[in-house]
Amino acid sequence: MIPAQDITGLILAGGRGSRMGGVDKGLQTFNGMPLALHTLTRLQMGGGVGQIMINANRNLAAYESFGASVWPDGLADYAGPLAGFLTGLEHCETPFLVTVPCDTPRLPLDLVPRLAAALEAENADIAMVAAPEIGKDGQVRLRPQPVFCLLRVELLESLVRFTQEGGRKIDAWTALHKTAVAPFDLPHDDPLAFFNANTLAELHQLENNPA
């Protein structure tokens, strides 16, 4: 098993928050606490990381008050979560980086160990979450959740090259590397663990649906 001190957690809070009316999503309140602080607390409680960073592009002092180092995108114009991956890898001082978005306050406490186990089992470069999702046909299928990733820091050079060539899609980049999948469909897994609140209405819906 990969020791916790070899893994840095990265909370992705650098988006525009367009579907929330342009607000800074990570600072929106969920059950009395900012979303990003919920995420940080869950990572700490899980014990799978040695340190935590936050990727944010505004209100940096507010994020710094959570006690983590904060780094803005190196790419311009809110280039998306892959820009956050790049920022995290550039500043990561451990062999592995795990990425999580700021808007999933119910992420599993065992997220990091399960990603690490999947990566080691397949000797992969990347491990990615797959979570159950109900399709339009009513069938439940496992769907990749590419913003929940465990990455080897040696991938930095590859990501620099990919973004310099104009690449911005996570799945297009991860497809270039051996990627393991960690399914989160066990009976005890929270079905809303990876539900990301894109609108204020969805955030309130999640608040009213306790785990």
From Swiss-Prot:
EC number(s) per entry: 2.7.7.77
Binding site for Mg(2+): D103
Compartments where located: Cytoplasm
Cofactor(s) needed by this chain: Mg(2+)
Catalytic activity, as annotated: Mo-molybdopterin + GTP + H(+) = Mo-molybdopterin guanine dinucleotide + diphosphate
GO cellular component, as recorded: cytoplasm
Its job: Transfers a GMP moiety from GTP to Mo-molybdopterin (Mo-MPT) cofactor (Moco or molybdenum cofactor) to form Mo-molybdopterin guanine dinucleotide (Mo-MGD) cofactor.
Entry remark concerning the domains of this protein: The N-terminal domain determines nucleotide recognition and specific binding, while the C-terminal domain determines the specific binding to the target protein.
Family per record: Belongs to the MobA family.
Entry-linked HAMAP family: MobA (MF_00316)
Protein name per UniProt: Molybdenum cofactor guanylyltransferase
Organism: Albidiferax ferrireducens (strain ATCC BAA-621 / DSM 15236 / T118)
